[in-house]
Structure formats: C-alpha cells, structure tokens
Amino acid sequence: MIFKVFYQETLTETPVREKTQSLYVEAESEVKVRQLLKDEPFHIEFVEKISDAHLAYEKENPDFALWEK
C-alpha cells in the first residue's frame, strides 16, 4: 500500500498549513509508516492511505517519488 504523509520540516516550530509538505511511503499499514519515519527530523501531521486512482494521479507529477531510507 502507498501512503501520503503530510509533514512539517521542523519539530520546533508550530505547524503552519502553508509550509506543509508531503512524501509517499510504501508500507503495510499506517503504524508501519510512522515506525519507518520515527527517526526523521520532521513533524508528521497526517498519514493517508491513497487509492489506486489517487496514486495514478500523483504519478503524473514529474516530482513523484517513493520515500526511501
């Protein structure tokens, strides 16, 4: 499954919607996504499982890439 993770780049500042970024992670569950990203230096706001149609749409963006550690 592919998950879209919305995050802020810093742990020390209050989250601001305009600074929210996203990345895509392949994992078995939302819990696994959070475990994979727990040591990263950013604040996870939301993790969303995306549908096949949503994934196809996101892949049209030339900047689309799955996160790799």
Swiss-Prot record:
Gene Ontology molecular function terms on file: DNA binding; DNA-directed RNA polymerase activity
Family to which the UniProt record says this protein belongs: Belongs to the RNA polymerase subunit epsilon family.
Source organism of the structure: Listeria monocytogenes serovar 1/2a (strain ATCC BAA-679 / EGD-e)
GO (cellular component) term, any one: DNA-directed RNA polymerase complex
Name of this chain's protein: DNA-directed RNA polymerase subunit epsilon
Domain of life: Bacteria
Role played: A non-essential component of RNA polymerase (RNAP).
Subunit: RNAP is composed of a core of 2 alpha, a beta and a beta' subunit. The core is associated with a delta subunit, and at least one of epsilon or omega. When a sigma factor is associated with the core the holoenzyme is formed, which can initiate transcription.
NCBIfam families hit by this protein: PRK13667.1
Keywords from the UniProt entry: DNA-directed RNA polymerase, Nucleotidyltransferase, Transcription, Transferase
Top enzyme class: transferase
Chemical reaction(s) catalysed: RNA(n) + a ribonucleoside 5'-triphosphate = RNA(n+1) + diphosphate
Signal sequence bounds: none
GO annotation, biological process: DNA-templated transcription
Entry EC no(s): 2.7.7.6
Lineage of origin: Bacteria, Bacillati, Bacillota, Bacilli, Bacillales
Pfam families: RpoY
